[in-house]
């Protein structure tokens, strides 16, 4: 039987394709269709590192659009507005607010909201060759009109008046000084090469953090697209280019500077974090030489943090004598005791008789304002948008009692699991250690999260911010280093995990959401230790129209000493989560104590030996 079966099946089964040709082609056609469909999916995945539109928070990734007919080529979106949504929609303007101008008469006229009023101003009218590229760059960035603060500040600056501006977060302050500065410079330094006007640092922008400096540089690059303007951020890598463009006495004479900034030296605050993680080098390392820029090519706009710029001025490597426009962004922070020792010499170094100054911030305490007016001609023109020192009205603010540190973490997890914390979001904490603790905890929860603080190298911070903008990271745990100026238009919720130390800190933190008229949400956790300071923040919520429980408004006001104490240092808190012991941290502290004890012991031994030797010499 077996042999008969083998005989019948030895040749194998044969299929006559010619006989069943029609049936066979039906299956082949289906296979080809399936293969074609799969290849299209693979190609789409390969080319589409693009996210689905539901996950593309900032609008950075291209999404396919089906056009029935070919249309004229649309203007591409610029890097400046890469996080603001689709290039086909204009950026929504913030809600209209009352703008108050005070100062010596006659007060300057505000610009019209249409863009041509910027380049056709009677005192600084640009030609079509000068103004055309600027208008084109603004159009590419989806900017089709000026906002209130930009009209007011632009009018002041174009009429050569020093200006002090207080405007809410997200109202467009950066463009309010960048645009008129570009208009007043008229031509790039490259076109003015060899002339006095094209030498040195022509315009200077000073900001408290490196991250904000990089963001402002991006704005300048976007609005100067199409012309060869020279702008840069002052870093270790660009120091040489800066002092070659605006050489000081030490560079001209070939002498070494007479001062040296120590590694890691800062202003006592983590915000001046550019130098915290990389050595600035000694003066000998960057010994001044004869300028390698003999043509004297200047820098149109230099964006700098105070510590590094002050170092160059103090070592006589850079001259700001030709600088005609000086802007202090986040000026209340720059005029505080932490930065004032560096900022005052910078302002003094801008010795051009025609120098024009502009100070801007979302908050301006009385002390900082009086100090600012001393540096402004005739006290400057004071521009206030809305109510001074108030929170942005587009943010829904609330306070949440959590009871303890473990309660904070539980509340945060509940917000995430219940969908009340949509991505992308920012979580503010009070210190570097707590940022790292919370970051590690959330990573273990499986959340796409990163941390940004002054303890990280700037390259790591830049990478984390970039990932956050493109949607690769959904949450950022941050310290005060990102509380000011940073523009994340896609952020929907801000969590104050640790209670803010001051009202300005609270206003700047929650100002990272609800920008440019978009709705946002801010939730602030508080515990028993935050009780004495709860009333001040509750008053901010009430002034913004947010509901506040009556008991918070009836609480005792904090004393002046309590306010000063909190402003100097945040309250001590238990580890994030409040549960268990951090064995690694305890081991690190123990090791540090052992090293310090060993050093003291060796020092005492050396002193003891020295005393014995002196005694023996006396006896001899």
Curated annotation (Swiss-Prot):
Start-end of Basic and acidic residues biased regions = 58-70, 252-265, 582-598, 605-614
Q: Does the keyword Zinc apply?
A: no
Report the EC number(s), separated by commas if there are several: 3.6.4.13
Question: Which InterPro entries would you find in this protein's record?
Answer: DEAD/DEAH_box_helicase_dom (IPR011545), DEAD_box_RNA_helicase (IPR050079), Helicase_ATP-bd (IPR014001), Helicase_C-like (IPR001650), P-loop_NTPase (IPR027417)
Q: What is this protein called?
A: ATP-dependent RNA helicase ROK1
User: Which residue ranges does the record annotate as region Disordered?
Assistant: 53-115, 244-292, 556-620
By sequence similarity, the record places it as follows: Belongs to the DEAD box helicase family. DDX52/ROK1 subfamily.
Keyword annotations for this protein?
ATP-binding, Helicase, Hydrolase, Nucleotide-binding, Nucleus, Ribosome biogenesis, RNA-binding, rRNA processing
């Amino acid at each position: 039987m077996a042999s008969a079966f083998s005989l019948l099946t030895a040749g194998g089964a044969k299929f006559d394709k010619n006989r069943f040709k029609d049936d066979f082609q039906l299956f082949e056609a289906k296979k080809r269709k399936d293969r074609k469909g799969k290849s299209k999916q693979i190609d789409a995945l390969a080319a589409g590192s693009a996210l689905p539109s539901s996950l593309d928070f900032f609008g950075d990734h291209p999404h396919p659009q089906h056009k029935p007919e070919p249309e004229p080529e649309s203007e591409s979106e610029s890097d400046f507005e890469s996080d603001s949504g689709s290039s086909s929609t204009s950026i929504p303007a913030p809600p209209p607010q009352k703008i108050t101008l005070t100062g010596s008469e006659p007060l300057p006229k505000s610009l019209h909201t249409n863009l041509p009023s910027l380049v056709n101003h009677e005192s600084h009218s640009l030609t079509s060759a000068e103004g055309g590229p600027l208008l084109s760059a603004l159009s590419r960035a989806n900017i089709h009109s000026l906002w209130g603060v930009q009209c007011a500040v632009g009018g002041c600056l174009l009429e050569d008046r020093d200006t002090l501006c207080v405007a809410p977060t997200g109202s467009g302050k950066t463009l309010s000084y960048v645009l008129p500065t570009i208009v007043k410079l008229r031509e790039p330094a490259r076109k003015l090469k060899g002339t006095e006007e094209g030498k040195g640092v022509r315009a200077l922008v000073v900001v408290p953090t490196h991250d904000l400096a990089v963001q402002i540089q991006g704005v300048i690059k976007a609005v100067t697209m199409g012309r060869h303007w020279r702008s840069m951020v002052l870093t270790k890598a660009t120091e040489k280019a800066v002092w070659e463009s605006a050489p000081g006495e030490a560079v001209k004479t070939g002498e070494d500077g007479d001062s040296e900034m120590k590694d890691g030296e800062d202003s006592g605050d983590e915000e001046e974090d550019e130098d915290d993680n990389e050595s600035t080098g000694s003066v000998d390392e960057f010994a001044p030489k004869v300028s390698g820029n003999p043509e004297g090519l200047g820098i149109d706009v230099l964006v700098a943090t105070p510590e590094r710029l002050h170092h160059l001025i103090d070592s006589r490597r850079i001259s700001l004598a030709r600088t005609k426009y000086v802007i202090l962004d986040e000026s209340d922070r720059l005029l505080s005791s932490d930065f004032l020792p560096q900022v005052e010499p910078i302002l003094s170094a801008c010795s051009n008789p025609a120098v024009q100054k502009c100070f801007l911030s979302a908050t301006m305490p009385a002390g900082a304002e009086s100090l600012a007016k001393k540096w402004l001609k005739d006290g400057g023109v004071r521009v206030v948008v809305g109510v001074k020192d108030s929170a942005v009205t587009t943010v829904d603010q609330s306070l949440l009692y959590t009871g303890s540190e473990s309660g904070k973490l539980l509340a945060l997890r509940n917000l995430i699991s219940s969908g009340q914390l949509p991505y992308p979001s920012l979580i503010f904490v009070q210190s570097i250690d707590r940022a790292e603790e919370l970051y590690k905890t959330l990573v273990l929860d499986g959340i796409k999260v990163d941390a940004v603080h002054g303890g990280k190298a700037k390259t790591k911070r830049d990478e984390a911010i970039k990932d956050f903008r493109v949607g690769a990271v959904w949450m950022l745990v941050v310290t005060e280093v990102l509380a000011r100026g940073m523009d994340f238009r896609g952020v929907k919720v801000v969590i104050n995990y640790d209670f803010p130390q001051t009202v300005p800190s609270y206003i700047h933190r929650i100002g990272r959401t609800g920008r440019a008229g978009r709705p946002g949400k801010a939730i602030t956790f508080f515990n028993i230790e935050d009780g004495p300071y709860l009333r001040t923040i509750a008053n901010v919520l009430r002034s913004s129209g947010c509901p506040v429980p009556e008991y918070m408004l009836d609480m005792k006001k904090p004393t002046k000493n309590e306010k000063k104490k909190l402003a100097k240092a945040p309250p001590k808190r238990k580890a994030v989560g409040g549960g268990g012991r951090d064995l690694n941290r305890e081991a690190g502290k123990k090791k540090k104590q052992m090293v310090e004890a060993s050093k003291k012991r060796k020092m005492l031994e050396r002193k003891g030996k020295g005393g014995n030797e002196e005694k023996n010499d006396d006896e001899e």
